[in-house]
Amino acid sequence: MKKIYLDDVRTPLDTEWIVVRNYSEFVTKVQDIGLNNISEISLDHDLGDTAMDEYFNNVQPNYTLNYDNIQEKTGYDCAKWLVEHYYQLNPPVDVPRLIMKKSEFKFPKITTHSANPIGASNITGYINNFLFNEAREQNCVRVKIAHV
C-alpha cells in the first residue's frame, strides 16, 4: 500500500511517502496507483503563491479565508476530488445504514498537515462529513509530519 503526501514546498523525512506538489500531480498519481492501493494521504491546503498570500494577508491576521483570492487549486480541492472519484468508482446505492456499515469500504486514511487552520478545518470537515454519510468512523485529523 502506498502513501501520498501533497505539499508544494515541504518534503517529509519518512521516505515511504510519495510526494506530489500540486492538484494535477495529485490527481494523476491517485489514478496511476489506484484508490484501493493507497493506505494514507496527507494534504497541505495552500498550494502556490496566491494561496500563501491569502494565508498571510487574511487567515493569519483576520482568521478569514476567501477562496476567490486563490488562483491555484488547494488541498481542499484535492479532498473534494477524492470523494468525487470514490463515487465514480463506487456509485451510491440506496441501502440502510446498518447494511452500509457491514459492507466493504475501501478509502485511504486522510489527514492534513496544513499550517493554515481554516484550510485544514475545511479539509477535515469535508472528509469527515463524507465518512459520516458512508456510516464510517470520522477519523480525518490535522497532524504534524516531520519534514525537511
Model-derived features: where do they sit?
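Catalytic phosphate/metal-binding cores of nucleic-acid and nucleotide-processing enzymes, i.e., regions
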Residues: 1-148
